[in-house]
Amino acid sequence: MITGKLITVEGPDGAGKTTVLEQLIPLLKQKVAQDILTTREPGGVAISEHIRELILDINHTAMDPKTELLLYIAARRQHLVEKVLPALEAGQLVFIDRFIDSSVAYQGAGRGLTKADIQWLNEFATDGLEPDLTLYFDVPSEIGLARINANQQREINRLDLETIEIHQRVRKGYLALAKEHPKRIVTIDATKPLKEVVSVALEHVLALLLA
């Protein structure tokens, strides 16, 4: 039985969501007694991390969109049963850096795969599990890619090599999802100063936990 809460963090490449999460968690631990788990997709457990390497390898430019989607789904399933569900059943507050919405935005809007197929596969992999809250960090594609290019410490992966048109379609996909699920997905302007972005994210998380 799930007694914990699931919060997912989403955004186009360069939105800074991972950095926000790193700063958000210590602040949250000062305010709640609940155990907190942070993890990521694809990855989080050994099998899923191996799949992550396959997906992001810059040499795998021939990867078919359906192959890409199925790899993400496989990584999601393993991560869920091995790490996420046990934590939720233990009553923990779980943060995942990317989850089901990424598939709709990237492989759906970005790659042009059918939304219905993606939703069915997500349902199959998660047994219908949905986040209690999704923090979507929005940033224009031009700004996001500029941030990536300016970050000398960030390792470039296969998805970073995509055209700006694909990144723009991904963003449009996210915005459509936010409009479709306004109660679950909150949109946060990630062009604002980092401290302000973290503060807004914290407010939304606390609102969920104190509701």
Curated annotation (Swiss-Prot):
Q: What does the entry list as the binding residues for ATP?
A: 11-18
Looking at the UniProt record for this protein, which Gene Ontology cellular component terms does it annotate, in alphabetical order? cytosol
Q: Write out the GO biological process terms.
A: dTDP biosynthetic process; dTTP biosynthetic process; dUDP biosynthetic process
- Gene Ontology MF: a single term: dTMP kinase activity
HAMAP family per the UniProt record, alphabetical: Thymidylate_kinase (MF_00165)
Q: Which PANTHER family match?
A: THYMIDYLATE KINASE, UMP-CMP KINASE 2, MITOCHONDRIAL
The record's comment on protein family reads: Belongs to the thymidylate kinase family.
Q: What is this protein called?
A: Thymidylate kinase
Q: Which organism is it from?
A: Streptococcus pyogenes serotype M49 (strain NZ131)
